[in-house]
C-alpha cells in the first residue's frame, strides 16, 4: 500500500518526500505514530493509522497529509498528551478557499480529539521569490493570503521551525549547457578544477553507509552542528535507497573520490519530479580540489535524467547577510545558479494554550542538553 499512498500524494500540489509512506515508516521506528489523512471531492475525510483502506476510497483525492503523532510522556498525569506534526504538509491547492477551510477545520478537530498540545504544519506555500528587498524580490499574493487565513484562525508562527523556511531552487528543465551558463563563473571554474585535479565520482551503495556516517560525523564536528546516532541515518538512507517510486530510486549517495579514496559525498533524494540535497559531508583532506562542486554538478545531471524538473538545495538563510550562520553555505548554493524561494514556515495550532506555553518554555532547555550530549558523543565516536 506504500505505492498507493505515494501515487496519491504525487498528484497533489507541491508533493514532498517528507510526506511519503517511507518517511512515515522511518519515524515509526523512533517513537512516532504515522496517520494518513485524505480529503476527497465527495466531501469525505478519511483518517487512519494505516494505508490499507486507501483502495476503498471512492472519491477523488483533493488533499492529503501524513501526520506524525508522538506521546509527550509515557506515564503520569500528562500521559494522554501528544504532539502532532505534518512535515511539509498538508498537500492541497491553497488558493481554493473552500477546500482550505475544510482541511483546516478537520485538522483542528483532529488536534482536539487526539489530545494534542499542538499540531504543527509547514506546507511548501511560497510567500515570495528572490532575496527580500532586492531587485529580484517578488511577493506571492496567494501565499500571503494563506498565511493571513492561518493567523485569523488562531494558528501561530512556531518558535520551533523544524525544516528550513527558505531554500534555493535550481531549474532542471533547461538544457545542460544552460544550467552551466546560469552558474557563477567561480562555480564553473571550480567544477573544471575538480575534474582537472583528478576528482572521481561514483554512485554509492548500501555497503558505503558506515563510511558515509563516519564522514558525516567528521563534518558535524568540524562545522559545529549536531547529528543523530548512526542507526538513525542508516535507517533513513537504507530505506529510501531500497525504495523505488515511479520506477526511479528514492535516494542515491553520490561519492567523490581522490585516488579511489572517498573525500566528499551527498545524498540525493527524489520524489514526484523534484530532487533534494539533504545530507552533505566531506573529509578534511583534499578540500582544495573542490569535490563538493563536482558532486553538485553530477547531482543536477542525475536528477534531470531521472525526470526531476527542479533541485531543492535544502536551506537558505533567514536573514540574507553575514550575520546569519547559513551565509557561507548560501553563497556556495547561490553560485549553482538557483533562485531563492521563501516559504510559509511552520505554524502551530494549540487547542490548549496553557499546555502549549509550558511545552514551549521547557522543551528548548531539554533540547539544549540533548544537543550538548550529542556533540560530545559524536566527538567520542570519532576517537
Regions found by a protein language model. Give the residues of each.
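A conserved beta-strand-loop-helix scaffold within acyl/acetyltransferase catalytic domains
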Residues: 1-45, 63-76, 123-134, 141, ...
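Conserved GNAT acetyl-CoA-binding A-motif
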Residues: 112-130, 304-315
Amino acid at each position: 500500500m506504500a505505492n498507493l499512498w505515494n501515487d496519491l500524494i504525487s498528484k497533489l500540489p507541491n508533493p514532498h518526500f517528507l510526506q511519503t509512506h517511507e518517511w512515515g515508516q522511518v519515524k515509526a521506528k523512533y517513537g512516532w505514530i504515522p496517520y494518513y489523512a485524505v480529503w476527497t471531492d465527495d466531501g469525505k475525510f478519511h483518517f487512519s493509522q494505516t494505508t490499507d483502506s486507501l483502495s476503498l476510497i471512492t472519491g477523488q483525492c483533493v488533499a492529503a497529509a501524513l501526520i506524525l503523532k508522538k506521546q509527550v510522556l509515557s506515564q503520569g498525569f500528562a500521559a494522554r498528551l501528544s504532539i502532532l506534526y505534518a512535515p511539509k504538509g498538508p498537500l492541497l491547492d491553497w488558493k481554493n478557499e473552500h477546500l482550505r477551510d475544510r482541511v483546516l477545520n478537520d485538522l483542528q478537530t483532529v488536534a482536539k480529539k487526539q489530545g494534542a498540545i499542538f499540531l504543527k504544519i509547514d506546507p511548501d506555500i511560497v510567500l515570495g521569490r528572490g532575496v527580500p528587498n532586492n531587485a529580484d524580490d517578488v511577493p506571492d499574493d496567494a501565499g500571503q493570503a494563506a498565511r493571513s487565513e492561518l493567523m485569523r484562525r488562531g494558528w501561530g508562527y512556531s518558535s520551533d521551525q523544524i525544516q528550513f523556511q527558505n531554500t534555493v531552487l535550481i531549474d532542471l528543465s533547461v538544457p545542460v549547457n544552460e544550467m552551466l551558463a546560469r552558474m557563477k563563473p567561480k562555480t564553473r571554474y571550480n567544477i573544471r578544477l575538480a575534474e582537472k585535479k583528478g576528482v572521481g565520482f561514483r554512485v554509492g551503495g548500501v555497503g558505503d553507509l558506515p563510511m558515509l556516517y563516519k564522514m558525516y560525523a567528521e563534518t558535524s564536528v568540524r562545522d559545529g552542528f549536531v547529528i543523530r546516532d548512526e542507526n538513525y541515518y542508516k535507517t533513513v538512507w537504507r530505506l529510501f535507497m531500497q525504495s523505488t517510486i515511479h520506477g526511479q530510486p528514492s535516494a542515491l549517495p553520490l561519492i567523490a573520490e581522490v585516488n579511489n579514496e572517498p573525500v566528499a559525498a551527498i545524498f540525493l533524494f527524489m520524489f514526484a519530479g523534484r530532487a533534494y540535497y539533504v545530507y552533505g559531508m566531506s573529509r578534511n583532506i583534499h578540500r582544495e580540489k573542490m569535490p563538493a562542486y563536482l558532486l553538485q554538478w553530477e547531482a543536477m545531471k542525475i536528477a534531470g535524467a531521472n525526470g526531476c524538473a527542479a533541485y531543492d538545495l535544502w536551506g537558505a538563510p533567514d536573514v540574507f547577510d553575514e550575520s546569519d550562520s547559513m551565509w557561507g553555505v548560501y553563497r556556495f548554493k547561490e553560485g549553482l545558479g538557483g533562485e531563492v524561494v521563501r516559504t510559509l514556515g511552520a505554524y502551530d495550532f494549540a487547542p490548549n494554550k496553557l499546555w502549549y506555553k509550558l511545552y514551549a518554555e521547557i522543551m528548548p532547555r531539554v533540547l539544549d542538553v540533548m544537543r550538548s550530549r550529542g556533540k560530545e558523543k559524536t566527538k567520542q565516536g570519532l576517537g
